[in-house]
Regions:
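Catalytic pocket-lining loop regions of alpha/beta-barrel enzymes
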Residues: 121-122, 136-253
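Histidine-centered catalytic micro-motifs
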Residues: 24-34, 155-159, 197
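Active-site neighborhood of phospho(di)ester-bond hydrolases with catalytic His/Asp-centered motifs
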Residues: 25-27, 74-75, 95, 124, ...
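Mid-to-C-terminal alpha-helical segments outside catalytic/metal-binding sites
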Residues: 2-4, 21-30, 36, 43-67, ...
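Active-site gating/metal-coordination segments in enzymes
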Residues: 79-165, 172-174
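Bacterial N-terminal signal peptides
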Residues: 5-15
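Active-site environment of divalent metal-dependent phosphoester hydrolases
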Residues: 32-34, 79-82, 101, 130-131, ...
């Protein structure tokens, strides 16, 4: 009888956990092509990344199911995003990852056609930091005009990048290009643009908060801050406390930025849930409600 009761209790706790953590929107997920896995990678904690593109997709979708992630903005090459969308088009919100305006042979004409063909739902992640540019540079303006015209949300990287990246794959990356203040001209020139910054400015989270104060249309995700390393988790705590104090939590959205490590999804969720200064309502808003409002999802 005791054993049976324990089994029932375990089942109840699992069910309660699933109910209490229902419906998450992840505003920052990455898809990759096979070539991205040619060089093995380990994270800050020494954990190896997924072995290949198929394993990475499966591990990420398994996490979606486990943690009730009902929608996810998937950013990657058009080819990889199409692969993910074909697996679960109801869950996947199609993004496109660009560090330079001409990545994948892209130009504004091709991009506008993709928008018309409903092959892109979010313009991002836009990694201007990695190419040593800013979203206010002239080369990006045709894309922004299209996004404003068709009401396509824009997601732009802020903060730094991977340690040593400037010495290898992103030689033009400089920390100064991660400052959210570099987006101010975009916010001024495109007042109707739906835009969210990624990583809440990271090192410059105070700048992110100040922009959110001046420009009430600006949202942010807190992706990568919740799991990748202790310094980023400190940024997450400080940013969220300040955003709560200022009354801006209603524009803060959950994101993972799992990169090659899908385990970061669960770790991010658990870390956010562990923050005792956030109420249950705060967490529900960050996990789902704020993103649903930003994305204008139908109820």
């Amino acid at each position: 009888m005791i054993k049976y009761s324990i089994i029932l209790l375990g089942s109840f706790l699992q069910a309660f956990s699933a109910i209490s953590q229902a419906s998450i929107i992840d505003m920052h997920i990455h898809s990759y092509e096979e070539s991205h896995f040619e060089n093995p990678a380990t994270d800050y904690y020494g954990n190896k990344g997924s072995k290949n593109a198929a394993a990475h997709q499966k591990e990420t979708f398994d996490a979606f199911a486990k943690y009730s992630i009902v929608k996810a903005v998937v950013s990657g090459s058009p080819k990889s995003v199409e692969t993910w969308d074909s697996k679960d088009s109801n869950r996947v919100i199609r993004g496109i990852a660009l560090n330079k305006p001409d990545d994948y042979g892209m130009d504004s004409v091709l991009f506008e056609q993709m928008v018309k063909d409903r092959k892109v739902d979010v313009f991002g992640e836009i990694g201007t930091y990695y190419s040593g540019t800013t979203l206010a540079d002239s080369a990006w303006q045709p894309y922004l005009r299209i996004c404003e015209r068709y009401d396509i949300p824009v997601a732009v990287h802020t903060g730094g990048g991977d340690p040593g990246g400037t010495y290898s794959w992103a030689p033009k990356a400089r920390l100064k290009f991660g400052d959210p203040y570099l987006l101010e001209d975009v916010l001024v020139n495109y007042p109707k643009l739906r835009i969210y910054i990624m990583h809440a400015g990271e090192d410059w989270y105070e700048h992110a908060l100040r922009l959110m104060a001046y420009y009430p249309q600006l949202y942010t995700d807190i992706a990568v801050l919740l799991w990748v390393e202790p310094l980023d988790q400190r940024y997450a705590i400080e940013f969220l406390k300040a955003a709560k104090l200022a009354g801006y939590l209603n524009r803060v959205m959950f994101g993972t930025d799992q990169m090659r490590w899908p385990y970061g999804i669960g770790k991010s969720i658990n870390f956010l849930n562990s923050l005792t200064f956030l109420t249950k309502k705060d967490k529900e808003d960050i996990f789902y409600n704020n993103a649903a409002a930003f994305l204008r999802l139908k109820k």
